[in-house]
């Protein structure tokens, strides 16, 4: 396929994705810009995959981390890691080349995995908010109310519901037959936008905001209770005081993770709703920026843990040293020096 850049122009639709009628126009970027974007995306994918892989390994390996909250963190990290491993490479090519070159089967599979991992993330953050709410607001009953078995049920729901939900829309024709007037065919050959239509724009909005409202309301209550506990903490014994402080620290850290998630995903979610009302007028470049800003969230959580959790930093130090080969390392106490 020939692509020609006009002299003095940075980029322009100078070619088509395929040499067929109805092909999508292809925006050709200068080689230097393409290489720069590929390198930036590669670094982002590396941080996403390795950072979340370490979370998965640390929680799995160190027995002291086998708690309900950490199992939820492990499952969340697994979703983010798989996003970086299976979704982002093809998304990078699509964004840089402005075309989908991988066929209809991979288009549908890529869309399925993309939606699955993103919905799984928000479900897990919602469940983690419930866990922190129980730990802070009802600390005496928390160990019996939120057990490992309960956490595993939440994890199963966090994966199962998004998997069934996304498969229903992508691999059945029920919605297509019932709401054909709302749905549009693929705008052109070489595009992979199966779920970007008016119906999905309206459906995506509550799927994002209902869990977000739940998380915000829970963390507001956590903040009120934690403030009250801070005034009472001096009267507690030293051991109980330390336990309460650890729970509050975890709630604060995970609250930051939820806040960053909202900031990263809000532009994309609002745009999908508004764009469906305005007949999809968002420029492709702006839409790609919103998508990648949302993807960026998957790399954030391990970075948050590094700066917030002593156990995470200690586990990282052990992983990068020879001590990881010692059988005693698996039972190491990561919470004390």
Swiss-Prot record:
GO cellular component: plasma membrane
One annotated GO biological process: G protein-coupled receptor signaling pathway
Pfam families in the cross-refs: 7tm_1 (PF00001)
UniProt cross-references to InterPro entries, sorted A to Z: GPCR_2-like_7TM (IPR017981), GPCR_Rhodpsn (IPR000276), GPCR_Rhodpsn_7TM (IPR017452), TAAR (IPR050569), TAAR_fam (IPR009132)
Topology, Cytoplasmic side: 60-70, 131-154, 226-253, 308-337
Segments on the Extracellular side according to the record's topology features: 1-38, 92-109, 176-204, 275-284
Coiled coil ranges: none
GO molecular function: trace-amine receptor activity; trimethylamine receptor activity
Keywords: Cell membrane, Disulfide bond, G-protein coupled receptor, Glycoprotein, Membrane, Receptor, Transducer, Transmembrane, Transmembrane helix
Superkingdom: Eukaryota
Bilayer topology: Multi-pass membrane protein
Region Extracellular Loop 2 (ECL2), annotated ranges: 176-189
Subcellular location: Cell membrane
PROSITE patterns: G_PROTEIN_RECEP_F1_1 (PS00237), G_PROTEIN_RECEP_F1_2 (PS50262)
Glycosylation sites: 21
Cross-referenced PANTHER family: HISTAMINE RECEPTOR-RELATED G-PROTEIN COUPLED RECEPTOR, TRACE AMINE-ASSOCIATED RECEPTOR 5
Function: Olfactory receptor specific for trimethylamine, a trace amine enriched in the urine of male rats, playing a role in social behavior. Also activated by N-methylpiperidine. Trimethylamine is present at high concentration in the urine of male after puberty and acts as an attractant. Trimethylamine-binding causes a conformation change that triggers signaling via G(s)-class of G alpha proteins (GNAL or GNAS). Also required to provide olfactory input into limbic brain areas to regulate emotional behaviors likely via modulation of the serotonin system.
Similarity remark: Belongs to the G-protein coupled receptor 1 family.
The protein's name: Trace amine-associated receptor 5
Species of the source: Rattus norvegicus
Taxonomic lineage: Eukaryota, Metazoa, Chordata, Craniata, Vertebrata
Primary gene name: Taar5
């Amino acid at each position: 396929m020939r692509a020609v850049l006009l002299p003095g122009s940075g980029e322009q639709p100078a070619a088509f994705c395929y040499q067929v009628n109805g092909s999508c126009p292809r925006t050709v970027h200068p080689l230097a810009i393409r290489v720069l974007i590929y390198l930036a995306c590669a670094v982002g994918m590396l941080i996403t995959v390795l950072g979340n892989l370490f979370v998965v390994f640390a929680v799995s390996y160190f027995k002291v981390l086998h708690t309900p909250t950490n199992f939820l963190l492990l499952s969340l990290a697994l979703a983010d890691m798989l996003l970086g491993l299976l979704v982002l490479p093809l998304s990078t090519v699509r964004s840089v080349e402005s075309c989908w070159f991988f066929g209809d089967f991979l288009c549908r599979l890529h869309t399925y995995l993309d939606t699955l991992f993103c919905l799984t993330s928000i479900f897990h953050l919602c469940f983690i908010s419930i866990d922190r709410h129980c730990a802070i607001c009802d600390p005496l009953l928390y160990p019996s109310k939120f057990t490992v078995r309960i956490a595993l049920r939440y994890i199963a729901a966090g994966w199962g519901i998004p998997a069934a939900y996304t498969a229903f829309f992508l691999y059945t024709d029920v919605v297509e037959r019932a709401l054909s007037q709302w749905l549009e065919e693929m705008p052109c050959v070489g595009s992979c936008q199966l779920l970007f239509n008016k119906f999905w724009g309206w459906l995506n909005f509550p799927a994002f905001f209902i869990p977000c409202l739940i998380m915000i309301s829970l963390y507001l209550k956590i903040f009120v209770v934690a403030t009250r506990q801070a005034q009472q903490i001096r009267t507690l014994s030293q051991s109980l005081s330390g336990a309460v402080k650890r729970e509050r620290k975890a709630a604060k850290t995970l609250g930051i993770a939820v806040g960053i998630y909202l900031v990263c995903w809000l532009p994309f979610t609002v745009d999908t709703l508004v764009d469906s009302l305005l007949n999809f007028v968002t420029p492709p470049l702006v839409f790609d920026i919103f998508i990648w800003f949302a993807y960026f969230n998957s790399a954030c959580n391990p970075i948050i843990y590094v700066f917030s959790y002593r156990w995470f930093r200690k586990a990282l130090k052990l992983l990068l040293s020879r001590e990881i080969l010692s059988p005693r390392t698996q039972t190491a106490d990561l919470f004390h020096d």
